[in-house]
C-alpha cells in the first residue's frame, strides 16, 4: 500500500464519508442505546464484505486482513452521543433530543472509510486489523464492556489506535497532532481526593 495511493483513494471516498457522517448525525443514540447507529454500522460493514460481530452490549467488531502473518492492530471509533437538544440550523440536524456534540459521528464515519480502504487492500496487509466500534464512551463504560466480552482476544490485539476530532483548538483545519509513543489519550476514570486541614 503506497501512501500516495491511499491518499488518492481516501479523497475519492471523501463525499461518501461526509454523507455517512451526516446520516449518523441525524440519528444519535446515547450510552448503550444506539440501535440506529449500530444497525447502520453493521450494514455498511457487511456491504463492504466484512463480517460484523457483536461485542458486549452494543459494540461491534470486524476483522480485515489475516491472510498473511503479522500482528493484530486495533482501530477504534466511539459511536454514542450526548443527551443534548441540537439547535444547529443545518439540514442534517438531530431531531430526537440527543446530539453528536463531541464528533463521534465523524469518528464512526472515518472508521467506516478506513475499513473500505483496508478492505480494498486486504491482500497487502501483513497481519490483521481489528475494527472496534464502541458504545457508551460518554459514560465511561463502553470500552470496559467490550473488553470484558473478549475484545482484546481472538485474535489477541498487539497495539491500538484511536483518534478524536478537536473543535475549538488553535490549529488550522486538516492538522493532525501525533503524540509520543505509548499511552496518550486521557483516561475516562474516577478518582477520590481527601483533603485534611483546619477550616
Give the residues covered by each predicted segment:
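Histidine/acidic-residue-rich, glycine-tolerant segments that coordinate divalent metal ions
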Residues: 82, 89-99, 123-199
Amino acid at each position: 500500500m503506497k501512501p500516495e495511493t491511499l491518499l488518492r483513494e481516501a479523497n475519492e471516498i471523501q463525499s461518501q464519508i461526509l454523507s455517512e457522517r451526516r446520516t449518523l448525525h441525524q440519528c444519535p443514540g446515547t450510552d448503550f442505546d444506539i440501535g440506529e447507529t449500530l444497525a447502520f454500522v453493521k450494514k455498511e460493514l457487511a456491504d463492504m464484505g466484512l463480517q460484523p460481530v457483536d461485542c458486549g452490549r452494543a459494540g461491534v467488531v470486524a476483522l480485515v486482513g489475516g491472510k498473511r502473518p503479522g500482528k493484530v492492530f486495533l482501530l477504534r471509533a466511539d459511536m454514542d452521543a450526548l443527551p443534548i437538544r441540537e439547535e444547529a440550523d443545518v439540514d442534517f440536524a438531530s431531531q430526537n433530543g440527543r446530539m453528536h456534540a463531541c464528533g463521534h459521528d465523524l469518528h464512526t464515519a472515518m472508521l467506516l472509510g478506513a475499513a473500505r480502504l483496508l478492505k480494498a487492500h486486504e491482500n497487502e496487509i501483513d497481519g490483521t486489523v481489528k475494527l472496534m466500534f464502541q458504545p457508551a464512551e460518554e459514560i465511561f463504560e463502553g470500552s470496559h464492556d467490550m473488553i470484558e466480552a473478549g475484545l482484546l482476544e481472538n485474535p489477541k490485539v498487539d497495539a491500538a489506535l484511536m483518534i478524536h476530532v478537536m473543535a475549538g483548538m488553535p490549529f488550522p483545519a486538516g492538522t493532525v497532532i501525533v503524540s509520543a509513543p505509548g499511552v496518550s489519550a486521557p483516561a475516562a476514570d474516577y478518582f477520590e481526593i481527601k483533603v485534611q486541614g483546619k477550616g
